[in-house]
């Protein structure tokens, strides 16, 4: 029963708790036992809350009295340590905040708790989320549950690793440059980067950092696509603080007319050649969609190399002065962790006229891609060109991010779902990208791919 609960979807757990087939306390205890079992090897959970079992007991009492708090009543979850939690230490992976205790929850945490979810603990992140290797000087390095010598990705590597390992049914990640999608890919789970402006970032660090933060979106990470669908409506919508969030209605993936979808697929973006196994996974995904009746064509969206270079230029535009300021304000000695030092030390701010030209180019690229998107409903492509790399090789993979980073510039929603598995057990993710505000289409497509591939598989830990 413990394994069944550890590996169940959040959707299944919510229904089982609500119908009293299982108790919330049983679900919480199963997750805590699994964390105790696997965390010494993967180092994904950096802190447990003191009151998870108490809250689970209260959830069970409420249910017995006929009170259902919301769609996640009694369901446990973990949370990336870049998101504030009232009364629970939030470090964002920086030494200066080792003992920092926020006095309020991030908006997404408030919404999850209001929906009845129970916080188990916090998961590891690189310092201020800025690395594709989940490592920091506070808690150390997180490892991939499918191969401990490999990275779980970043920056949401802690969330991806513990969800994949069965320690929590879901977590909330952040994605500035594929930081939900890359870890979902290498850890074999499902992850959603919503449309930019869909989910409030209030209470997430690095915080309001201008151009850098404008590319960031928060989203759910889970073992099953159905859980992304369950969680998005809970997270989405204005909170009266994040000035970039719009009150746009969500579509329902279950009523998407799949046989009317115009789907474009490609396996090679012309920047980084994917492995043969990655090509096979994407082709299998497109075959599954074709069998479902979509109208399919092969084409690479125009100007992906320019789009990626423009995003990279904008992120580097101030020479990472924003990161240096944050590290100083946090009281972290020196230049922060090795990962952030790699970014800060070579940074040279752009002159104003060059920055203006870069912003203009970004808007021109967005406009061109939107015009191209006029007769496209869904894009299917690699999440990354290779599976999880070994620890310490992160910088070598940077151009691999070109498959996913582009959509931090466009702001389009994207889902990654497990589409294949290497002979050694390493997962391969497939990415599905939809037009702005059409998460329903991306999720509907991901559900088809998941059904064909089998989706998440338990690691042999």
List each model region and its residues.
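Glycine/threonine-rich flexible loop motifs
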Residues: 90-99, 275, 389-397
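Glycine-rich, small-residue loops and helix-cap segments
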Residues: 20, 31, 74, 114, ...
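A short helix-breaking turn/cap at a secondary-structure junction
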Residues: 193-283, 453-461
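An N-terminal boundary/leader segment
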Residues: 1-54, 291-293, 349, 458-461
């Amino acid at each position: 029963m413990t394994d069944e609960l550890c590996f169940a979807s959040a959707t299944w757990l919510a229904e089982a708790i609500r119908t009293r087939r299982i108790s919330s306390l049983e679900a919480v205890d199963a997750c805590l036992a699994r964390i105790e079992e696997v965390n010494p090897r993967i180092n994904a959970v950096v802190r447990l809350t003191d009151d998870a079992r108490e809250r689970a007991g209260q959830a069970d009492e409420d249910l017995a009295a006929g009170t259902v708090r919301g769609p996640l009543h009694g369901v446990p979850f973990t949370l990336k340590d870049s998101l504030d939690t009232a009364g629970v230490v939030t470090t964002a992976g920086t030494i200066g905040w080792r003992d920092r205790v926020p006095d309020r929850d991030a908006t997404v945490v408030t919404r999850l708790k209001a929906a009845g979810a129970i916080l188990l603990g916090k998961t590891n992140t690189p310092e201020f989320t800025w690395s594709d290797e989940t490592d920091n000087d506070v808690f150390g390095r997180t490892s991939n549950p499918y191969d401990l010598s490999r990275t779980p990705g970043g920056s949401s590597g802690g969330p991806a690793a513990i969800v994949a390992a069965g320690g929590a049914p879901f977590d909330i990640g952040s994605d500035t440059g594929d930081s939900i999608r890359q870890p979902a890919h290498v850890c074999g789970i499902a992850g959603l980067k919503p449309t930019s402006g869909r989910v409030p970032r209030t209470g997430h660090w690095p915080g309001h950092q201008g151009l850098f933060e404008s590319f960031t979106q928060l989203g759910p990470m889970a073992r099953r696509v159905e859980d992304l669908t369950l969680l998005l409506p809970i997270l989405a919508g204005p909170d009266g603080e994040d000035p970039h969030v719009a009150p746009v209605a969500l579509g329902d993936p279950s009523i998407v007319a799949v046989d009317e979808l115009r789907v474009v697929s490609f396996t090679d973006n012309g920047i980084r050649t994917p492995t043969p196994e990655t090509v096979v996974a994407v082709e299998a995904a497109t075959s599954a969609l074709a069998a479902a009746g979509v109208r399919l064509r092969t084409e690479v969206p125009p100007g992906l190399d320019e789009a990626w270079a423009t995003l990279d230029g904008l992120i580097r535009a101030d020479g990472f002065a924003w990161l240096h300021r944050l590290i100083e304000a946090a009281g972290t000695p020196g230049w922060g962790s090795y990962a952030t030092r790699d970014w800060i030390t070579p940074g040279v701010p752009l002159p104003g006229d060059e920055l203006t030209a870069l912003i203009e180019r970004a808007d021109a690229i967005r406009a061109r891609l939107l015009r191209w998107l006029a007769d496209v409903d869904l894009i299917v492509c690699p999440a990354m060109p290779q599976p999880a790399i070994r620890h310490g090789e992160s910088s070598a993979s940077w151009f691999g991010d070109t498959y996913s980073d582009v959509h931090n510039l466009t702001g389009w929603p994207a889902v990654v779902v497990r589409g294949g598995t290497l002979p050694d057990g390493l997962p391969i993710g497939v990415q599905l990208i939809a037009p702005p505000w059409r998460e329903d289409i991306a999720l509907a497509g991901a559900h088809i791919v998941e059904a064909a591939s089998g989706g998440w598989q338990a690691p042999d830990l």
